[in-house]
Amino acid sequence: MWDDDNNAPGARIAMPAPVLIHVAPVTPTLAPGVRAVEVAPAQSAYVGNTAFNLLDAESDANSEAMAILVNGRVIGFYRLDFGPRSVIGRELGTPHIGVRAFCIDHRHQGRGHGSRAAAAMAEDVRRRHPDQRLMVLAVHARNRVGIAAYQRAGFVHNGQYMSGGRAGPQLVMFRYLPAQR
């Protein structure tokens, strides 16, 4: 809250409202907000069209469409892939979940939401899928902002790359999930 004279001794400085980021399965109520998520044109080669990705996830029995919310408002989307060869096309020898089409709406980028959402995503998977020990995703090798956001959320790149793809070479990143106590 601002005092009338914010330069006076003892004046209080306005503190921004806390940003509460959480993730949730897409419901019919959240779906319109997810379909409205847009990335910048230069990013569309990395994640594609969100409305298409939502429809594709909802039609795949091995997928779960997820919304990223800030203070209850949809700002992003991703897809959990439960297939045994998800993301990298081969089995990993440990129970894992793939992450696809992770995106933050371009109007909400640059605020740290991506790394906080990725951390919330990992916590959600650990809580709702306690049998899973690993998350795996692929991120375009030139997407330095995305790579840094995933690293801040605990994902690591172990040197594996995937060639090809519609946007070019991608780093394979992993996030290990500790067992619940």
What are these regions, as identified by a protein language model?
Residues 1-7, 37, 122:
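Long, low-complexity, intrinsically disordered N-terminal extensions of eukaryotic proteins, enriched
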Residues 2-16, 161-181:
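Terminal substrate-recognition subdomain of acyl/acetyltransferases
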Residues 16-20, 25-101, 105-107, 115-120, ...:
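Acetyl-CoA-dependent GNAT
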Residues 81, 136-138, 158:
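Solvent-exposed beta-strand sheet faces enriched in polar/charged residues
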Residues 105-107, 111, 141-142:
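Active-site acidic-Proline motif in GNAT/NAT acetyltransferases
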Residues 112, 130, 154:
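Short glycine-rich hinge loops at helix-strand junctions in the catalytic core
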Residues 115, 141-159:
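Conserved active-site alpha-helix within GNAT-family acetyltransferase domains
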Residues 131, 135-147, 163-168, 175-176:
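Conserved beta-strand-loop-alpha-helix junction that forms the acyl-donor binding cleft
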